[in-house]
Amino acid sequence: GKRMHSKIQKQFLEIGGKPILYYSMECFQKSPLIQDIILVTGEDMISYCQSEIVEKYGFTKVCKVTAGGKERYDSVYAGLLCCQDTDYVYIHDGARPFVTEEMIQRGYEAVKRTNACVMGMPSKDTVKLADPSGYIKETPDRKIVWNIQTPQIFSYDLIRGAYESIRKKDMTGVTDDAMVVEQETGTKILLVEGSYQNIKITTPEDLAIAEAFLRY
C-alpha cells in the first residue's frame, strides 16, 4: 500500500473494472489441476473477501478464507495450516494477476519430478551487487540471473516441514518460499519459465502497465 500511495491494499485495487485479485483467482478456479483454493488475507478483510471476491465471482474452489500474519511468511504458514489431503501446493501472490493456466501446467509437470519449483524469467537487465556504502561490489553473469515470480510450487510435506523448522529461528531476511526450502532442507529447486507479463503490481506505474496488458 505504501509504494502504491493508496489506503487500499494493492490486490483490491481495480484493473479492467475488477479487483487485481480477481484475475489470478479466476485462473486457479479454471485450472483442472487445482482442487482447492485457500485465500489468505488480513483479518479485517475476511468478510470483504468472502462476499466481494469469493461469492460475487463464484469462486467455488475456495474452501477457506483465513487471516494471515504480520509478514508474508506468517501468511504463507497460516495458509499451509489450512491445507488438507493435498500432494502439492501452489503459493501465489494476489498482486500478480497475469498467471496463466499454462504456467500452472508447467509447474505441475515440474513439481511431480522435483518436489520443488518456482516460476521466473531470465533477467533482461544487468544486475549489480552493492557493498554497504552503495558502491558496486560485483557484477554477476546475467546468463545465470533470474527474476523470481510466483506461483512457487512444492510437495506439501516438504514446504510444511521447511516452515515448521524455520519458524523456530530468526526469519529476518526471508523473502520467498523457495528461500525457506533452500535453507531448511537443502532441496534443489527447479526454475520454470513464467512470463515477463507475470508482473507483481506494486507501484502506480505497474497499475498502468497492467491496464495496458488487459487491453492488448
Task: For the regions a language model picked out, list residue spans one by one.
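Residues at the starts of beta-strands that form the adenosine-phosphate
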Residues: 35-37, 115-116, 188
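Short beta-strand-to-turn element immediately C-terminal to the catalytic PLP-Schiff-base lysine
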Residues: 15, 128-131, 192, 201-202
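Short helix-capping segments at alpha-helix termini
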Residues: 31-33, 54-62, 85
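Acidic helix N-cap motif at the loop->helix transition within catalytic regions
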Residues: 47-53
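Short, flexible, basic/aromatic active-site loop/helix in glycosyltransferases
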Residues: 129-152
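Conserved beta-loop-beta/alpha segment of the NTase-like Rossmann-fold superfamily
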Residues: 64, 70-130, 149
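Conserved alpha/beta core of the MobA/IspD/sugar-nucleotide pyrophosphorylase nucleotidyltransferase superfamily
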Residues: 146-216
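N-terminal glycine-rich phosphate-binding loop and ensuing alpha1 helix
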Residues: 1-46
